[in-house]
Curated annotation (Swiss-Prot):
Lineage per the UniProt record: Eukaryota, Viridiplantae, Streptophyta, Embryophyta, Tracheophyta
GO cellular component terms, A-Z: cortical endoplasmic reticulum; cytoplasm; endoplasmic reticulum; endoplasmic reticulum membrane; membrane
Recorded phenotype for the gene knockout or disruption: No visible phenotype under normal growth conditions, but mutant plants are impaired in hydrotropic response.
Function: Plays a role in lateral root development by maintaining auxin levels. This function requires GNOM (GN/MIZ2) activity. Negatively regulates cytokinin sensitivity on root development. Positively regulates hydrotropism in roots.
Protein name: Protein MIZU-KUSSEI 1
InterPro entries in UniProt: MIZ1-like_pln (IPR006460)
Naturally occurring in which organism (per UniProt): Arabidopsis thaliana
Length: 297
């Protein structure tokens, strides 16, 4: 049996302390330039080696971009000013078919001016007017239009139906009165100045109505003064029993009671040849509805 022996191995450390010269190294010896070729290439100092500009990089000064944006801003400003002036030059027509002017103040002089204007044309009335239907029980109905409940009437229409017939029609809850007149060529007559109208009530021809403009009789003044404090309502006004009682003579034709109905009407202007008055129900409880149309055809 072989006896156990310890073996010791020693490592040897050796290094080469020779420095490698890149000029004399074998890898660079094959790439060393000849003196003739190196003489043709100028030498570049080390401090200027990284300061050579690239041909592909173009330097754009900041002043040129700011001047371009300034020019664009001036162009937008001039264009906006030109557009605004162009819009101001254009006159866009507005629809004045349904436009109603504001009513004037309720003084006596202005009220007289209102009467003269409305008898010549209905454009000075407001959108809300006061309408009164009145007449003797056995006589014809008169329709009065006022700016307010205390002003002078601007339109008086003697309708072609009796008061009793109107009361009977209104008991059905729906009354449509249409007044038509012929349009005359080259006529400057206003709608309220038309003297004669053909009257229709709920589609049935009733006869002819007469317009008196704003001319009031003594009976008209008495009725309107009596109901001047009434805004909405209906009733009976005490009157003489006969026509002759008014003049002082003892006998005559019996007129009957004078009935009236008063309320606010909404006035709608369709054109210079058409207007409408709609009776407004204040409590909206489905009461009698009345509409009066003025048409020039």
């Amino acid at each position: 049996m072989v006896p156990y022996q310890e073996l010791t191995l020693q490592r040897s450390f050796s290094y080469n302390s020779r420095k490698i010269n890149p000029v004399t190294s074998p890898a660079r010896s094959s790439h060393v330039r000849s003196p003739s070729s190196s003489a043709l290439i100028p030498s570049i100092p080390e401090h200027e080696l990284f300061l050579v500009p690239c041909r592909r990089c173009s330097y754009v000064p900041l002043s040129s971009s700011s001047s371009a944006s300034h020019n664009i801003g001036k162009f937008h400003l001039k264009f906006s000013l030109l557009l605004r002036s162009f819009i101001n030059i254009i006159n866009i027509p507005a629809c004045k078919m349904l436009s109603l002017p504001s009513p004037p103040s309720s003084s006596s002089s202005v009220s007289n001016q209102l009467i003269s204007l409305v008898t010549g044309g209905s454009s000075s009335l407001g959108r809300r007017v006061t309408g009164t239907l009145y007449g003797h029980k056995r006589g014809h109905v008169t329709f009065s239009v006022q700016y307010n409940q205390r002003s002078d009437p601007v339109l008086l229409l003697d309708l072609a139906m009796s008061t009793a017939t109107l009361v009977k029609e209104m008991s059905s809850g729906l009354v449509r009165i249409a007044l038509e007149c012929e349009k005359r060529h080259r006529s400057g007559t206003k709608l309220f100045q038309e003297p004669k109208w053909t009257m229709y009530c709920n589609g049935r021809k009733c006869g002819y109505a007469v317009s008196r403009g704003g001319a009031c009789t003594d009976t008209d003044w008495r009725v309107l003064n009596t109901v001047s404090r009434v805004t909405v309502g209906a009733g009976v006004i005490p009157t003489p029993k006969t026509i002759d009682d008014v003049s002082g003579v003892g006998s005559g034709t019996e007129l009957g009671e004078l009935l009236y109905m008063r309320g606010k009407f909404e006035r709608v202007v369709g054109s210079r040849d058409s207007e409408a008055f709609y009776m407004m129900n204040p409590d909206k409880n489905g009461g009698p509805e009345l509409s009066i149309f003025l048409l020039r055809i």
